[in-house]
Amino acid sequence: LKTALIVDWPSVDATSGSIMSEWEWQVTSELMKLADFKPDLIAFAHPAYVQKWGTLFVGGKVGGELLPFAKSCRDKLVEKLRGYDVVLTLGAHAMFCLTGEYKIDTFRGTHVDSPLVPGLQVVPTYGPPLYARTAWNERPVVVSAMRKAKQRFVDKPRTIYLPDNIADLYAFSTQHIGDEIVFDVETNKSCRITEFSVATSSACCLYVQLEDMGYQSQWSERDELDIWLWLRFLADRKDLAWGFHNATFDLTYLDKYAIKPKGPIFDTMLRHHAWQPELEKSLGFLASMHLPTRAWKHLRTRAKKDFNKAGAL
């Protein structure tokens, strides 16, 4: 596996011939040692320190067209990385040069296929000025990204079941549900459940949409009642464990529908808080820290025109 580490540009106080300041390099080296990350190449995306990122773009618009010199630097970087497998980018500009994406909080800690370098996967994370100088609490995030950059992401087959009728729900529970499920709901401003998903493994999930964003039901009144009765059927099983992320939220909504799981309840948010109480608790953050997964939270926002379909997946 051929790996590289690319930073945005040399630090403001980096010595001649260096990419980072002495302190930034000390911190980065310690994090690389913790992650056992040993890149074959360490380089920058832009050869000179930049105070304001927008000055590299036409009209100062970040994420738009690069100015000629910045574009030529990007092109040189692309050529240099041909033949590499995985690149860890430290900073938003390095990520942008290889992926075209500029929102680092959205893609940080995930594998992104580069549209510019065939076969290259990019794992973005924060730059040295942040984790070495101002935000020490982001260092575990950087270590996690370094660990992810040691291997390529491999997409695994997944099956998402979309029921056409009530019989499909019972067929799913008979064929796929054992003694444990994980459950998630999405709701609207009227405090109704608009969609939910039930997963039995990382490769098997059932998704049910109840309403669209226009508050229009996707089922007949009789069928919707039967959907809730199916969930109550699952909730009555004392041998069925239910997993949630922030169980209080989901269970509060289920309770309004008289659905009260009688089996064991486990909550990944509370488990992580007990393990690492100082870290963020959102599902997107935890997935980027601990799971080999693609970025997905932004897809829900982009899908609003399609009524947030698959929002609960």
Give the residues covered by each predicted segment.
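Flexible, charged surface loops at secondary-structure boundaries
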Residues: 1, 80-83, 174-177, 233-239
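Short hydrophobic/charged patches on amphipathic alpha-helices used for structural packing
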Residues: 74-78, 170-174, 228-232
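Acidic beta-strand-to-loop metal/phosphate-binding motif
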Residues: 84-92, 182, 239-247
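Short hydrophobic beta-strand that contains or immediately precedes a catalytic carboxylate
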Residues: 5-7, 125, 181-184, 265-266
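N-terminal accessory regions of nucleic-acid-interacting proteins
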Residues: 140-185, 189, 211, 224-227
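Conserved hydrophobic/aromatic pocket- or pore-lining residues that grip, position, or stack substrates
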Residues: 28, 184, 196
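A polyanion-binding, active-site-adjacent surface
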Residues: 1-154
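Active-site-proximal helix-loop-helix substrate-binding element of RNase H-like nuclease domains
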Residues: 120-123, 128-131, 153-164, 191-194, ...
